[in-house]
């Protein structure tokens, strides 16, 4: 044992040294906005072209790995926090794990590009400057994603997935499974499973061109040691040019490294990344003022290339993160594990708001400047043990989680005033149909960068769970709970929020046979309660207890060998802050109640024909609103019905050729709580093709996709009295070679 321990420590030191050595290759001067350059020795590439051999075509891989379902688009296993890794048929929750094959073949560049394959997910993203979505009708953002099950260390603003092998989507709250999300998302959890070196050496180069004028280069390299114990995976990524939105440009440079080391009794991984991302002239949402809401019933009809983001706006971010995770088997029935991660984010952003005031298109433009440094530290420690009792096997888990945020921030909302007098940045009037913009540099004046400590947040929790399975494996019961503590210090207000909450969960799954599983669960989600800030409220200054979202869910899963399908029905309630119209007392209320029915399917029913998709029926309502004014109204931003159908078809007459199609449909949705402005239903079609062949024994794949094929001009409903104009028809072309 001592020898193995020394060997493990030595290998970890070697792995960490490799990480430190590799990462500087992609370091750049992000803070100054300039990219560092490096002079490399001359690299000679020697190749030999075959004289008379024709190009050899190849078919899609015929067999899938055991962890991927038929068709290769969905992984069988998911990582579910205290439940560990489990097959989807053995999980009493609705979870989908999108594979790297789907990510590559759909040319997905962001997390949203992947998760919109699920109809339970609605896109709230604003062009290239934000990553946001709804899961089962509740909002979540990039800040609430996990990396290998750990909150707080994923890039805070950047949603790229160059280093990601799988994107796991848990639908529904998950307080027991992974703790409270940093920003309090309760509708579901997105978990990134990072890439690992595979058994065979990998060197993949991908060149892409698309959107307006966007050029991308991506290098993916993986190697394992001779004994297979140590693996290294490196991803280098560069992206620059015009996006799908008018005048918007992006410039991204990123590097990632993933290490793993395995022995007979231990498994250790380390992931690190550094990202520089700049977006100029971003597209923004259209907001509706109270006056406009009184006069409008739908968003205005505008040209598909209309622009609501002002010229001269920008967002510059630098993200650095690292995650170390390790497991050690004390014996065959007891394992200890731990994880440690950190992230540092620098952000410098100037954005604008475009507020429509009248049906004639009269609008107002205002600006906001924000620069911040965000630091996060996250950790987890625990043990899992197996105990066999008469008739029932127990899998016990005890874990403790810790996360600490520090935010240094300066935010200026224009107009800027000194001694009550407007100095610069006064709101100006324009038109939604023919917008005229002010010159930002002269209009706003110099932007002052300073980052005083603004606030801190600490999340601590302890979770205990017992997974009980009958000896025949037919019944599994999950019983557990998490004690969550929330401490928030607002430096500017000189206030402290400190509350705690116990969150229980119960679940069961019954395997009727190898093909059918029935399940049910009750689980909660947690979010920080708010402070009463209304000075007229009798309880001014009080801190509301943490908000508790509660979910009841029932479902069935069917594994038919080549096709799998899941059906689930759920009800989620989530409170908010409400003011009593008579007493003026502020309390937790204003409940949102979402009830839904989900149907998902995936697989390869016939060789060469692959399917993914599903349907979602949602009844999302406001309840317990102030004075009952909006009781029964539909929750804004959520369609009653959504559907996604993705099809891939191999053309057997042309080896290596595959045609693809995806249809996305959303029914109408409201943008305001009073339900007076409705966005029309919309359907979007995406078509594509890929061709796989060999050149001199080198596998090559050419992919071409057209998004929004029919150039559909449509609005996407958001919350907070806003809508977003989607991009018109765009394309993406790429060539990948595996050496």
Stretches found by the model and what they are:
Residues 327-329, 335-341, 345-351, 545-624, ...:
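Membrane-embedded beta-barrel scaffold of Gram-negative outer-membrane proteins
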Residues 162-165, 175-255, 261-267, 320, ...:
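Outer-membrane beta-barrel translocator/receptor signature
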Residues 241-243, 258-329, 342-374, 419-450:
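Acidic/polar loop-and-plug regions of large Gram-negative outer-membrane beta-barrel proteins
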Residues 374, 393-405, 451-574, 604-606, ...:
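Structural signature of Gram-negative outer-membrane beta-barrels, strongest in the C-terminal barrel
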Residues 6-7, 372, 395-396, 520, ...:
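Conserved C-terminal beta-signal and adjacent last beta-strands/turns
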Residues 278-291, 404-409, 509-553, 558, ...:
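Surface-exposed extracellular loop regions of Gram-negative outer-membrane beta-barrel proteins
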Residues 41-200, 554:
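Acidic, small-polar-rich N-terminal luminal/periplasmic segments of exported/outer-membrane proteins
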Residues 471-474, 571-573, 588-673, 734-738:
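Gram-negative outer-membrane beta-barrel transporters
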């Amino acid at each position: 044992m001592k020898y193995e321990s020394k060997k493990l420590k030595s290998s970890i030191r070697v792995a960490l040294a490799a990480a430190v050595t590799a990462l500087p290759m992609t370091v750049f001067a992000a803070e100054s906005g300039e990219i560092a350059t490096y002079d490399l020795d001359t690299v000679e590439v020697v190749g030999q072209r075959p004289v008379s051999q024709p190009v050899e075509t190849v078919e899609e891989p015929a067999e899938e790995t055991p962890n991927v379902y038929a068709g290769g688009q969905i992984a069988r296993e998911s990582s579910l926090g205290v439940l560990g890794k489990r097959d989807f048929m053995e999980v009493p929750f609705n979870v989908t794990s999108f594979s790297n094959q789907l990510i590559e073949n759909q040319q997905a560049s962001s997390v949203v590009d992947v998760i919109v394959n699920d109809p339970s997910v609605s896109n709230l993203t604003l062009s290239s400057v934000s990553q946001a979505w709804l899961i089962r009708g509740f909002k979540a953002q990039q800040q609430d994603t996990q990396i290998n099950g750990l909150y707080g260390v994923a890039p805070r603003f950047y949603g790229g997935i160059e280093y990601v092998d799988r994107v796991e989507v848990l639908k529904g709250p998950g307080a027991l499974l992974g703790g409270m999300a940093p920003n309090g998302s309760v509708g579901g959890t997105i978990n990134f499973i990072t890439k690992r070196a595979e058994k065979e050496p990998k060197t993949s180069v991908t060149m892409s061109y698309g959107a307006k004028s966007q050029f991308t280069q991506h290098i993916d390299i993986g190697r394992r040691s001779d004994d297979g114990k140590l693996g290294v995976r490196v991803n280098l990524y560069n992206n620059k040019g015009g996006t799908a939105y008018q005048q918007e440009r992006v410039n991204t440079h990123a590097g990632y490294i993933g290490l793993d080391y395995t022995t007979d009794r231990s498994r250790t991984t380390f992931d690190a990344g550094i990202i520089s991302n700049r977006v100029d002239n971003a597209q923004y949402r259209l907001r509706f003022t109270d006056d406009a809401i009184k006069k409008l019933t739908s968003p205005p009809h505008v040209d598909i290339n209309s622009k609501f983001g002002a010229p001269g706006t920008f967002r510059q971010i630098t993200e650095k993160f690292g995650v170390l995770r390790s497991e050690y088997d004390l014996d065959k029935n007891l394992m200890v594990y731990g994880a440690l991660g950190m992230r540092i984010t620098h952000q410098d952003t100037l954005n604008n708001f475009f507020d429509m005031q009248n049906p004639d298109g009269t609008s107002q433009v205002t600006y906001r400047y924000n620069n911040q440094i965000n630091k996060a530290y996250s950790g987890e420690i625990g043990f899992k043990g197996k105990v066999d009792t008469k008739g029932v096997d127990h899998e016990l888990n005890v874990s403790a989680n810790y996360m600490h945020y520090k935010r240094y921030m300066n935010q200026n909302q224009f107009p800027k005033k000194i001694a009550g007098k407007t100095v610069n940045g006064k709101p100006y009037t324009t038109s939604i149909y023919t917008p005229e913009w002010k010159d930002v540099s002269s209009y706003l004046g110099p932007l002052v960068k300073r980052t005083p400590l603004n606030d801190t947040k600490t999340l601590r929790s302890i979770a205990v769970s017992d997974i009980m399975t009958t000896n025949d494996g037919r019944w599994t019961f999950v019983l557990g709970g998490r004690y969550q503590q929330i401490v928030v210090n607002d430096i500017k207000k000189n206030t402290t929020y400190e509350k705690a909450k116990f969150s229980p969960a119960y679940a069961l799954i019954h395997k009727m046979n190898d093909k059918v599983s029935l399940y049910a669960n009750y689980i909660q989600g947690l979010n920080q309660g708010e402070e009463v800030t209304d000075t007229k409220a009798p309880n001014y200054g009080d801190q509301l207890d943490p908000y508790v979202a509660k979910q009841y869910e029932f479902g069935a899963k069917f594994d038919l060998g080549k096709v799998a399908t899941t059906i689930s029905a759920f009800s989620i309630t989530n409170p908010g802050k409400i003011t009593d119209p008579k007493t003026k007392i502020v309390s937790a209320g204003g409940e949102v109640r979402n009830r839904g029915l989900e149907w998902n399917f995936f697989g390869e029913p016939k060789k060469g024909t692959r399917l993914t998709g599903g349907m979602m029926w949602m009844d999302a309502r406001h309840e317990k609103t102030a004075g009952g004014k909006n009781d029964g109204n539909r929750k804004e931003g959520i369609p009653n019905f959504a559907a996604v159908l993705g099809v891939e078809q191999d053309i057997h007459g042309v080896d290596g050729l595959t045609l693809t199609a995806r249809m996305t449909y959303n029914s109408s949705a409201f943008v305001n709580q009073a339900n007076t402005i409705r966005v029309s239903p919309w359907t979007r079609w995406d078509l594509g093709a890929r061709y796989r062949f060999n050149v001199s024994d080198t596998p090559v794949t050419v992919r071409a996709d057209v998004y929004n094929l029919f150039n559909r001009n449509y609005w996407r409903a958001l919350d907070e009295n806003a809508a977003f104009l989607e991009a018109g028809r765009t394309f993406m072309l790429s060539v990948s070679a595996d050496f």
